[in-house]
């Protein structure tokens, strides 16, 4: 068996068998084929696709050649929630303490930000939370608080890291079978009872349309069914920034305000999405028989401050400073700020969430290369959201950084604003 034969077979649109797929995955793992040959194989998949059996075999081989992680959840229902990536997506920061307050166990492995989408790990590290824990330390967090959020182990689905790195530089990122196998290989490697996927679509997501997102959801469902695992995929709109904050500490701040139910500085779209996700989890896991009961359970852990107290316990158990979050003066303290104001009255629209994400990256909130350093205090705050009324002189957008904010970035921010009468 050799890679040329596999490339030619897939180029002709023929299905690969178990032996061929296992050979390919092991060849990638053991570095016995060149990057350009792997790329040619990925390009053949991009053009010809994969049938459900091929997709299952590829995902299984990627899972089996890496570490399988299993934690003791002490009889509680174990859940994992994954977002396909969005701008301003701080859902996991608030969701994990809410779920543990509702009696679930959450062993969550998260990633760093790259490109236009932020990473939960970067946000937690920006406020002093330790995210590199041994399995024993992670289990201790589960024992105490029923949750942890840590960085993904290098030993989970190692072949995916190779394939993703090559897809990223060869124009094959948007292959739906490759996206599905990439996401699912990492999720299936951690033995949780339920997997929930928040699948984003729109201008600020890699699935630009709802149709494409639905196709991807079906592929992931097919994989989960083959593995006999419980998966729920729900679509959510990413045509605008989620919530009001984009950055690291600033996004943690919005999530904290939400958990404290201090909602003046929290986006309504974020509030709505949080409720939708939690209700879905309660219903899918049969912890609530009706939507109304799910809403009641959800609202109780927020109004009683159970979720907020769980958040503080989570922070403490992973080496964070709880006083940072309880001090009156707050913890988001950027050195520099620039306000972008409306130049006329009317209805506000932003050009594209990715335009705002680019400004955030330029300010230091994100990275375009893995080696880029992040400024924890850099970011944006939307004082107004899409379709809101603005008057001349209203502050629409604030920019923050630990370094002086250049006129170039201010000008770029002004260009993202469209006001129609």
Curated annotation (Swiss-Prot):
Protein family (similarity comment): Belongs to the thymidine/pyrimidine-nucleoside phosphorylase family.
Protein function: The enzymes which catalyze the reversible phosphorolysis of pyrimidine nucleosides are involved in the degradation of these compounds and in their utilization as carbon and energy sources, or in the rescue of pyrimidine bases for nucleotide synthesis.
InterPro entries named among the record's database cross-references: Glycosyl_Trfase_fam3 (IPR000312), Glycosyl_Trfase_fam3_N_dom (IPR017459), Glycosyl_Trfase_fam3_N_dom_sf (IPR036320), Nuc_phospho_transferase (IPR035902), PYNP-like_C_sf (IPR036566), PYNP_C (IPR013102), Pyrmidine_PPas_bac/euk (IPR018090), Pyrmidine_PPase_CS (IPR017872)
Entries under Pfam families matching the protein: Glycos_trans_3N (PF02885), Glycos_transf_3 (PF00591), PYNP_C (PF07831)
Residues in the signal sequence: none
GO terms, biological process: pyrimidine nucleobase metabolic process; pyrimidine nucleoside metabolic process
Statement: the UniProt record of this protein carries the keyword Transferase: yes
UniProt protein name: Thymidine phosphorylase
GN (gene name): deoA
Assembly behavior: Homodimer.
EC assignment: 2.4.2.4
Protein keywords: Glycosyltransferase, Transferase
GO molecular function: 1,4-alpha-oligoglucan phosphorylase activity; thymidine phosphorylase activity
Organism superkingdom: Bacteria
A Gene Ontology term for the protein's cellular component: cytosol
Catalytic reaction list: thymidine + phosphate = 2-deoxy-alpha-D-ribose 1-phosphate + thymine
